[in-house]
């Protein structure tokens, strides 16, 4: 039971962290995971539209 609660907490926390990173479309990135959904890491290492 505690494992389920912790798992749910970390999933929500990851989601909030990713939303926190989504403020700017030109955020620096290394991989597509560093960008929010709908954006990808461009060759200039900035989050841009897909």
Curated annotation (Swiss-Prot):
Keywords: Disulfide bond, Ion channel impairing toxin, Knottin, Secreted, Signal, Toxin
Coiled coil: none
GO molecular function, one term: toxin activity
Functional summary from the UniProt entry: Probable ion channel inhibitor.
Source species, domain of life: Eukaryota
Annotated disulfide bonds: 22-36, 29-41, 35-47
Cellular location(s): Secreted
Originating organism: Chilobrachys guangxiensis (Chinese earth tiger tarantula)
Main location: secreted
Protein name (database record): U23-theraphotoxin-Cg1a 2
Family that this chain belongs to: Belongs to the neurotoxin 10 (Hwtx-1) family. 64 (Jztx-20) subfamily.
Cellular component, GO, one term: extracellular region
Tissue expression pattern: Expressed by the venom gland.
Comment on protein domains: The presence of a 'disulfide through disulfide knot' structurally defines this protein as a knottin.
